[in-house]
Design a protein with these regions (language model features):
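Channel- or pocket-lining gating/hinge segments that regulate access to a cavity or pore
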Residues: 242-244
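Boundary at the C-terminal end of the N-terminal hydrophobic targeting segment
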Residues: 31-33
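Feature captures the catalytic cores and cofactor-binding loops of soluble hydro-lyases/lyases
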Residues: 73-77, 81-232, 246-313
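Bacterial N-terminal signal peptides
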Residues: 13-28
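Amphipathic alpha-helical packing elements
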Residues: 37-73, 78
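N-terminal secretory signal peptides that target proteins for export/translocation
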Residues: 1-11
Length: 313
């Protein structure tokens, strides 16, 4: 009932201009007390290039099959496509990483907090109460998570009181998203307990304090994580180095190119194993026309094998 009440709150208020400076760009978005969200039409407009179906809230829904395929991606494979598209601000790093051996893949569910301002919070809480929501908290957003989501939280790098989850809410997030993951430009608490839960997480710091002195200002709106603007529904891919946020319109191309990159690396190492060539003769492009033709034939054969295997699953 609380989640349904939130949707009612989100959908019932009139559209107004942005109250906060960062949101001026998105004047069509709806402001509901201090809780700001995009309507389904807003999300559709701002992610219009997505080729995929959408959730009821308007977020692009990258297919489950592509999520599974994306578990094999590395940061370098993603970079190869995005830099060609001139999308050079899609990567964030410098995190503490929980379970770095476990790839993190899912659809971005974005949440924004700002430093507490009591007069704004009072109005927000009053309006929330009118719609059956006792408080606007971190759990307001967490309770909306779905399978395949990665919880993306802009807590403006806050350490003390910037703890989006402890072990209990981290466990709930793991169950709700089916081990999707968490990225927070902020902190977590109960690190010992969280470390035992099988879900990847990227966080700036750990701190024993509960979340506080902040206010929830956005759900499924553009948020900033490091130097990245993250949109709801972006494909989130995390590895040992950091996190990429891939716009949906590039997902298929990234995955296809990744196959080619892996095959190229596979062939290159085979040639190095033969011990007959200098590195410059093979990498990154074979200099000998016969070797180049050999590689192209190998690439074609392996692509056919890989795609046949995927079609059989």
């Amino acid at each position: 009932m609380r989640t349904q009440a939130l949707y009612t709150l989100v959908q019932s208020s009139s559209t107004v201009a942005f109250l906060f400076c960062a949101i001026t760009l998105f004047a069509p978005a709806s402001l509901h007390a201090q809780l700001i969200t995009f309507s389904r039409q807003d999300l559709t407009d701002y992610t219009a290039q997505s080729p995929f179906e959408r959730f009821p809230d308007g977020r692009p829904r990258v297919p489950d099959g592509l999520l599974q395929q994306a578990r094999e991606l590395s940061s370098e494979e993603v970079w190869a496509v995005l830099q060609e598209k001139n999308f050079n601000n899609q990567y964030a790093d410098g995190f503490h990483i929980l379970h770095p051996e476990k790839p993190m893949v899912g659809r971005a569910f974005t949440v924004q907090f700002m430093p507490l301002r009591s007069d704004v919070e009072h109005i927000a809480e009053t309006k929330a109460n009118e719609h059956g929501i006792l408080r606007l908290t971190n759990q307001t957003a967490i309770d909306m998570l779905q399978p395949g989501d990665v919880l993306i939280v802009d807590l403006f790098g806050k350490k003390v009181g910037g703890t989006i989850v402890g072990d209990n809410l981290f466990y709930y997030t793991m169950k709700a998203t089916r081990s999707g993951g968490l990225v927070v430009d902020g902190s977590i608490r109960d690190l010992n307990g969280i470390s035992e839960i099988d879900m990847p997480a990227y966080f700036r710091s750990a701190d024993p304090t509960p979340i506080g002195n902040v206010m929830l200002t956005g759900i499924n709106v553009p948020v900033r994580i490091g130097g990245v603007t993250v949109m709801p529904g972006d494909l989130v891919v995390g590895d040992r180095e950091g996190v990429y946020f891939i716009p949906p319109q590039f997902v298929k191309e990234v995955l296809d190119r990744a196959d080619e990159i892996r095959i190229h690396d596979e062939w290159t190492k085979k040639k190095f194993d033969e011990g007959k060539y200098k590195s410059s003769e093979i990498y990154s492009t074979p200099k000998d026309p016969k070797l180049l033709q050999e590689y192209q034939e190998y690439l074609k054969k392996r692509l056919e094998e890989i795609r046949k295997q995927r079609n059989q699953k």
